[in-house]
Amino acid sequence: MQTRNAFSWLKKQITRSISVSLMIYILTRTSISSAYPIFAQQGYENPREATGRIVCANCHLANKPVEIEVPQAVLPDTVFEAVVRIPYDMQLKQVLANGKRGGLNVGAVLILPEGFELAPPDRISPEMKEKIGNLSFQSYRPNKKNILVIGPVPGQKYSEITFPILSPDPATKKDVRFLKYPIYVGGNRGRGQIYPDGSKSNNTVYNATAAGIVSKIIRKEKGGYEITIADASDGRQVVDIIPPGPELLVSEGESIKFDQPLTSNPNVGGFGQGDAEIVFQDPLRAQGLLFFLASVILAQIFLVLKKKQFEKVQLAEMNF
């Protein structure tokens, strides 16, 4: 009987442990999957709006630079590098979700011409693999292989991101044309200020939702504040909730206006976008150009030789 009770107790403990582990996994998975650039993938069919604006700017409000470097021209069915640089001061620390300070993450979206896509691993050279590191790229949508996203990844290590790109093969993709194409890029460093549902993160400034007197400020146990604003005209009280992270700028008894900043703006990151051009080169045209240049060089050589021969003849006639 005692053995049976012990077995029953052990069974309950194992079941409880599995349940707790499963719950932690689900919560963790949800937290990770909610990270950028997943937000854009979930909310927008195309990351680039008709105006040319990349949708990441809807959540990352500060404007920061981004750079892209691609070859001037590429041949069909070749692998090349698209290097995206997201510069920022490595000494900066951002406000994390728990209100503490930590390093900045970076992310990027690369919008390639139709037909261009992520190079398969067996086509990537060892030198390029070394530049890529442990990065894992993914398509924006299964049917949009020309749009690639990456992030969030540690900015200290990956402020320069190398995308391995495979150019299309006209032999298998008949709709591809040999033209000059634009490439668009967006890159962010740090967390956003707005979530896709419109709510604020703790990485932005918080403003007063009413005018009046700050009658009470309660500091929460886990960080953040509850600020009670009393409207002197009708006695109505409004409570503004400040999450952990931003620094408080007001004090009790202070008179404030509507939309006045209650906190500092802790954001040190931002988003930027840029573009570049690449020529999808026809091999036959390239060969023709080389042949033309070679013929011009040979013609120049023959002209020089002919001129020297003529000069020798003239010199011989003069001596005669």
Curated annotation (Swiss-Prot):
Which SUPFAM superfamilies does the protein's record reference? Cytochrome f subunit of the cytochrome b6f complex, transmembrane anchor, Cytochrome f, large domain, Rudiment single hybrid motif
Q: Binding positions for heme?
A: 36, 56, 59-60
> How is the cofactor bound here?
Binds 1 heme group covalently.
A GO molecular function for this record? heme binding
Q: Which domain of life is it from?
A: Eukaryota
Which PANTHER family does the protein's record reference? CYTOCHROME F (PTHR33288:SF10), PTHR33288
Q: Which HAMAP family match?
A: Cytb6_f_cytF (MF_00610)
This chain belongs to the protein called Cytochrome f
Traced from the root, the source organism's taxonomic lineage reads:
Eukaryota, Viridiplantae, Streptophyta, Embryophyta, Tracheophyta
Q: Which gene encodes it?
A: petA
